[in-house]
Every structure is written in structure tokens, then in C-alpha cells.
């Protein structure tokens, strides 16, 4: 599986996790704190913090520079700006979720709102990458370049 395929698969996994995140927040809004919700959020914390940062890093370090070389007018600058917003939302979720989890009910909106914002921002961002950026990469990069990116990006 090459780097672009791997990133696309990760996007599909994130889309499912984002839906789960929104469902859990809806559940907490309706029912309050509960062990099921906390267990589910605990499972989502690493994917939406550490793993998400790693995903963005692989795009920024391996794919985006090659795209800028070959297609300087590509939407890479937009993608980079969106990465900043997404990673900030991710950080807010990670920081305040743990405070709330440890018992501070006032921290709920401080993590839930950024998490819901993350869902919207990241969902549209992934669509741009899947529908515009990745097909562009396949057009302007050779198969050999994509294989090389895959070797260093994994």
C-alpha cells in the first residue's frame, strides 16, 4: 500500500471515529457522564491527539513538499493552514477532556465544543485531500516517486 492509499484508509477510519465522537457527545448531552461514554472517549483520545498529529506530520513532511515542487499552485497552503486549526482543536480536546474525566464538570464544553468543531473541520479537510489533493498527487508524481514517499513515510 503506498502512502496516498495509507492516508486515504486512515481518513476512512477517522470518519468513523468522528461519527462516534459526535454520538458520544450527544449521549453525554442527553444523559450526562457515564462509564460507557468515558470508555469510548478514552479509546478515541490517542487517535485524535497523538495519531492525528503523526498523520498530519507524514502529509507535511513527505507528500506536501513534493506536491509544491510539481504543482506550486496546488492547495497545499490551504491544507497546511487547516492542519494548524485541526491540531489546535485536537489539543483542546485532549487537554480539557482529561480535566473533565478527572471530575471537573465545568471543563465539559471546553473539550466537547472543540471536539465537535474538529469533526466539522477535519471532515471537510479529508474530503479536500481525498477528492482534490491526492488525485493531483497521482497526476503530477510518478509511480516511482510515490513508492519512494511510501518507503520514507511509513
Named regions from a protein language model:
Residues 1-154:
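Small-residue-biased structural context
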Amino acid at each position: 500500500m503506498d502512502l496516498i492509499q495509507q492516508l486515504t484508509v486512515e481518513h476512512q477510519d477517522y470518519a468513523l471515529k468522528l461519527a462516534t465522537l459526535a454520538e458520544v457527545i450527544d449521549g453525554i448531552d442527553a444523559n450526562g457522564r457515564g462509564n460507557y461514554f468515558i470508555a469510548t472517549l478514552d479509546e478515541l483520545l490517542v487517535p485524535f491527539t497523538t495519531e492525528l498529529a503523526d498523520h498530519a506530520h507524514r502529509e507535511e513532511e513527505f507528500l506536501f513538499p513534493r506536491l509544491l515542487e510539481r504543482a506550486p499552485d496546488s492547495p497545499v497552503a490551504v491544507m497546511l493552514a487547516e492542519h494548524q486549526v485541526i491540531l489546535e482543536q485536537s489539543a483542546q480536546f485532549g487537554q480539557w477532556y482529561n480535566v473533565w474525566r478527572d471530575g471537573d464538570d465545568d471543563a465539559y464544553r471546553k473539550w466537547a465544543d472543540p471536539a465537535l468543531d474538529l469533526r466539522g473541520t477535519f471532515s471537510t479537510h479529508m474530503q479536500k485531500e481525498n477528492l482534490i489533493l491526492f488525485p493531483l498527487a497521482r497526476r503530477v508524481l510518478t509511480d516511482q516517486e510515490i513508492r519512494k514517499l511510501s518507503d520514507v513515510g511509513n
